[in-house]
């Protein structure tokens, strides 16, 4: 059962204070409890933008290269379930002026089908690929992985049936 919208709105109101809340985790017991409840089992990776900038060196061009967008596209192609959030909770919470708020996270996997429909919608594989392309063109960077916090705030599970692809901006996102 997904979480109600009021819970998401509460998170949006707390989000601007995330750095203060993060500092509280320096208190040993608060840090241990927070890690256990919200982050245990996380496996997240930021993928750099699709560009290579050589610095003062001559480089041979490799025959093949996996670009970060190809990693994301691989998982989209393999997934049976695709679900796009209709806003970025980070950018909406921070009232971002530099990047589109409507380019939200993409969730893959069976658990994504339990997300509250007021937050977004299921999409086809082609729509998911188009979504990440628009995110890249907007200058957003992909964060991909399994995130326990997403299963908590979205009220879904199991976590091993959900893969999150966030589309992060440098000014608002975690």
At which residue positions do the language-model features occur?
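Iron-sulfur (Fe-S) cluster-binding modules
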Residues: 1-142, 159-163
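Redox cofactor-anchoring modules in respiratory/redox and cofactor-processing assemblies
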Residues: 140-174
């Amino acid at each position: 059962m997904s979480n109600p919208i009021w819970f998401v709105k509460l998170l949006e109101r707390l989000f601007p204070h995330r750095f203060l809340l993060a500092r509280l985790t320096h208190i040993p017991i608060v840090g241990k409890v927070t890690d256990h409840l919200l982050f245990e089992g996380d496996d997240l990776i930021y993928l750099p933008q699709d560009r290579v900038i050589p610095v003062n060196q001559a480089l041979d061009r490799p025959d093949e290269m996996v670009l970060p967008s190809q990693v994301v596209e691989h998982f989209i192609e393999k997934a049976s379930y695709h679900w796009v959030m209709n806003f970025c909770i980070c950018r909406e919470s921070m009232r971002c002026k530099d990047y589109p708020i409507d380019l939200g996270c993409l969730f893959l996997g069976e658990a994504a089908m339990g997300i509250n429909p007021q937050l977004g919608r299921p999409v086809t594989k082609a729509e998911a690929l188009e979504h990440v392309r628009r995110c890249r063109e907007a200058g957003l960077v992909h964060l991909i992985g399994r995130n326990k916090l997403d299963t908590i705030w979205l009220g879904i599970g199991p976590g091993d049936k959900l893969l999150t692809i966030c589309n992060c901006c440098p000014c608002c996102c975690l």
